[in-house]
Amino acid sequence: MTILTTLIKEDNHFQDLNQVFGQANTLVTGLSPSAKVTMIAEKYAQSNQQLLLITNNLYQADKLETDLLQFVDVEELYKYPVQDIMTEEFSTQSPQLMSERIRTLTALAQGKKGLFIVPLNGLKKWLTPVEMWQNHQMTLRVGEDIDVDQFLNKLVNMGYKRESVVSHIGEFSLRGGIIDIFPLIGEPIRIELFDTEIDSIRDFDVETQRSKDNIEEVDITTASDYIITEEVISHLKEELKTAYENTRPKIDKSVRNDLKETYESFKLFESTYFDHQILRRLVAFMYETPSTIIDYFQKDAIIAVDEFNRIKETEESLTVESDSFISNVIESGNGFIGQSFIKYDDFETLIEGYPVTYFSLFATTMPIKLNHIIKFSCKPVQQFYGQYDIMRSEFQRYVNQNYHIVVLVETETKVERMQAMLSEMHIPSITKLHRSMSSGQAVIIEGSLSEGFELPDMGLVVITERELFKSKQKKQRKRTKAISNAEKIKSYQDLNVGDYIVHVHHGVGRYLGVETLEVGQIHRDYIKLQYKGTDQLFVPVDQMDQVQKYVASEDKTPKLNKLGGSEWKKTKAKVQQSVEDIAEELIDLYKEREMAEGYQYGEDTAEQTTFELDFPYELTPDQAKSIDEIKDDMQKSRPMDRLLCGDVGYGKTEVAVRAAFKAVMEGKQVAFLVPTTILAQQHYETLIERMQDFPVEIQLMSRFRTPKEIKQTKEGLKTGFVDIVVGTHKLLSKDIQYKDLGLLIVDEEQRFGVRHKERIKTLKHNVDVLTLTATPIPRTLHMSMLGVRDLSVIETPPENRFPVQTYVLEQNMSFIKEALERELSRDGQVFYLYNKVQSIYEKREQLQMLMPDANIAVAHGQMTERDLEETMLSFINNEYDILVTTTIIETGVDVPNANTLIIEDADRFGLSQLYQLRGRVGRSSRIGYAYFLHPANKVLTETAEDRLQAIKEFTELGSGFKIAMRDLNIRGAGNLLGKQQHGFIDTVGFDLYSQMLEEAVNEKRGIKEPESEVPEVEVDLNLDAYLPTEYIANEQAKIEIYKKLRKTETFDQIIDIKDELIDRFNDYPVEVARLLDIVEIKVHALHSGITLIKDKGKIIDIHLSVKATENIDGEVLFKATQPLGRTMKVGVQNNAMTITLTKQNQWLDSLKFLVKCIEESMRISDEA
């Protein structure tokens, strides 16, 4: 974009503006948004000061930011995103917007140069005093000394929460001399101390908890946009007490108890940890002199104001909204007199003392003394939309008038295409920049702005893809580091105290934790389980593989088994029988698939390559991998049966479109089967748009087509004239004949009925099948894992997707009104989810009274199919602003313009449902907002809290596939293998059921469990060898380490575990060292055929297997063990060698030495 700024800065009109910009109050009129951005960016480039750009709302700030990213380095561009002050202060929310706010405040507090975009809401919001914010900026360096207590206190002040293990943003932990911190910005950090000196700083992976790279220094940013110190709390207590006493007599007696509860709920008087999320709503009482963001700017900052009159309008409505909101919360006993979130001073007063440059598209009167008025003449560019003749004549006019013509396109391929097109029109053009660009020619460069513009006085025109081809601007990739490492999903197998478990031999019990018991003066760790009545079972941690978490249907509370009874054996036998029947079916499926003969496609054609280059976006790595896997399948003779699992809007359709094109290029027909008429229409339009430049005949079969058109399509399929047909279950009718069907694409297969699924099954025999799904239902997920189907997963989001901002809050009409107004003010649409059909029309009336000017429609499952489709289509076509709907929108509706979702009674929904519903918004380059409301004063069930907590955690894009696993944890396995299996899964739990099924399938396939070369080794030594609670306090971490130790088979794995222990928990004590020694002995024993090592008090007994006895080289063994002298004796028992070792000082080392010698004499024997 350098060419554009070069042309502008050399122009006299800009130079006039540049002289007064930031020097005196100036009004600049006539510039379109993109032209204005170009001027502001050039002014910023030429100055050394901070530049503040104020907009009327966040939507406008987002739009200007997208254009500014073309000119300003991403590291120097900042935004202070405040969407809706009241909602943000009263709800639990996603961390992304807060991390952007913190990044901005931190840069300002450090005096960094930057271009800062701040919406009016952000300008007026109360903030922590600047000095306090500056005092809480921390940079840690290796070699420095820190006061640990003071440092941890500061972390708490900054909004961090102490946990035993860090797994979420905003947490820290202390284990010995190791401090872990997960900041809002950047990677999780591990600081290792040597006494008070920082010995090392490393970033680490929250999933594995392992360190990655060493770092010399790190900035620790706050985890909240408020700092709350003990002094702040002390001031807050006094102010709040006064506010409470002032408010109580002035409110209705009926809500005084509610006010008392509200007052006490802040727990200011007995808590040691203060919840920033709750206290932020008391910001007006926190600080003696709170700041606003203006106080953070340097005194010589340049200020630009975008559309003053719009800002004044927004300010008026913000004041009214704020007053009304505060009145509501006071009247309902949820707030106090004096509570506020914004500074009520006029906008002009806030920026008093700074020379301000006001930008306005039209000349306007303003209540401000202006020193200069600069008028630009700026015209919009003619919209060509691909019309060749109009384009040619307009370009010719620019050439004749000696204009500088700048053409912006988004990819290198398009630059080449555009030059070829202009060459055909005989328009001179260049694509490489020279020192000076001569007028009367076009320069085509990679770049994008939201719109083109013409500046006649400058002789400059900028033309974008929007004018050329009606393309929308691709949103520039921004910093993603702040959110890239956000929530990683923990295993759905994580055990918490109180969880139900299944012991393979004893049945369903309850997990009560890990307990260290002393038996015969030896300490060991055991897993404590509760069974029916008072029965308890202590399972040694080395047998923990026999214990699994119980996972089944969400509403199923399992019955505890009795220890020692026959009930569990009978249950398992029943399940075994049913599992064997299912295994039989699966094997038949598998055999059919292996033996079936399908069409074998060739390598990609030249047309395929051209078609793929046409895709305007860059593929994500997962998309590319999935495409390769699908093509590999198509190029085999066996028919493809692949499940493509990817989150909503992750580009599954593009993958399917490429497979369809490949099939068509080899003369095959493609059927694209979808569950709804509207989805059929949307996929049809996508295919038409993608394949418009290629000779591919695409038709649609749905109720939107006339009988005559349907008849023609059927005829075309029979004759081969139609290449691709998109449709609903009509495609499965018996009367449809294909000339040569090669590929069947099925979208959301689980939404089809049994009859349709059967028909799909018959088509699968010799046709390639690709199934698309956003949330894999466990059945499909599991079948894929069993190898009956292949699985491809798209987990990476497209570049321009931003996680949906998720708020969880109490139901409140003020919040709802603000959320609706915010979305409609940016010309967007809203899904309002209300899942009670009987009162849905009353809800519509209620919303209509709230929003009299909005067009509101209703959609629910009891409407006729035709009415429902017509309503949905009208909503998609932007004829309605708000759609009040039930969960029928859960899947398959794509409304890119609907970017706000409000769900009433969100606590009643299952997790995968909430996730799917949230996937309806945030599908364009705009940020999406989801508000999950739960009734005020309602105590949520633990499961509902779990669900809402999980959905808040998974604000990262792409948690869909993993959520299916988490969903098994919360919602249960559901109908995993059809209804008849449901009860069996509930009886034994999902994991044991799956294990039994897999074993049955393998047995019937003739696949034997890989038998170990040597039998299981039993090592029983009278030693304190365990993980003490003082070393690892967190039980889940403890279980995780025990599991790793149990699975250890090589010395490299032992070294890895030692490194992990030191990395995560610091140097280990003697009990842990012995535990590692025992594991090392076990590994030697595994490789040498030892079956038992038993401590018998004064001696250690060692038994070898018969096979090992035959293979051992006795001579080598005796020579190697000479240092042990008479402490070692050898004998034979049942044709197997036994060795006894007399215990003396350092006997554990002697045992390690002996076992190692046995292994070596075995290896030498093998080599001989």
UniProtKB/Swiss-Prot annotation:
The record's annotation in PROSITE patterns points to: HELICASE_ATP_BIND_1, HELICASE_CTER
| Major localization listed first in the record, in broad terms | cytoplasm
Q: Which residues form the Helicase C-terminal domain?
A: 808-969
Which amino acid positions bind ATP, per UniProt? G646, D647, V648, G649, Y650, G651, K652, T653
**EC main group:** hydrolase
PANTHER family, sorted: ATP-DEPENDENT DNA HELICASE HOMOLOG RECG, CHLOROPLASTIC
In its UniProt entry, what is this protein called?
Answer: Transcription-repair-coupling factor
Could you tell me which species this protein originates from?
Staphylococcus aureus (strain MRSA252)
| Gene that encodes the chain | mfd
